[in-house]
Amino acid sequence: QAAGLMIAAINAVMASLGICDRTIHCKNEGPALCGIEMIKYFKENHYDENILIVGYQPSIISNLTANMKNVRVLDLNPDNIGYEKCGAIIEDGERAMKGAVEWADVILCTGSTVCNGTLVDYLDTGKKTYFFGTTLAGTAKLLDLDRLCFADIV
């Protein structure tokens, strides 16, 4: 909980200073529209590549699995691991991480990795890595991470 409060404070201060943007989560049809924008981006930039999604975000997963050739998904939630959801078998984010990263050409990580401490696992993989969502807004700016967030579009 303390990490979440710190991340929220960083985002609020940095947004109020105009240093980062898109710090408010999408509502209503926003997540579905985000998934559509994400697939447009990946079709244009990473069509034939192996895509590893880190974190369970249904709209993004369902859009990428339906439109891209090779997608794997990692998550830490035991309620998701081992089940097929949104067109993908959700793999254990701890046990399958090393092999999944080796397999991937590109990695798409939830911004929640900054809260649960797994962000560091994806910083120096040697793979093109994007972080998505609003949670990571301030941290992405501070660490100069590639961030995909379509909140301003949706």
Regions flagged by a language model, labelled:
Residues Q1-P58, N63:
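Electropositive, gly/pro-rich neighborhoods at or near active sites that engage anionic ligands
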Residues N50, D105-V106:
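Structural motif
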Residues N50, K69-R72, K128:
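Residues at the starts of beta-strands that form the adenosine-phosphate
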Residues V54-Y56, L74-L76, G93, C109-S112, ...:
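Short His-Asn-centered micro-motif
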Residues Y56-E91:
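Histidine/lysine/aspartate-rich catalytic loop segments that bind and position anionic ligands
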Residues L64-N67, V101-E102, D121-K127:
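Short, conserved loop/helix-junction motifs that constitute active-site signature segments
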Residues I90-E102:
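Short acidic low-complexity segments
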Residues T118-V154:
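C-terminal functional extensions of proteins
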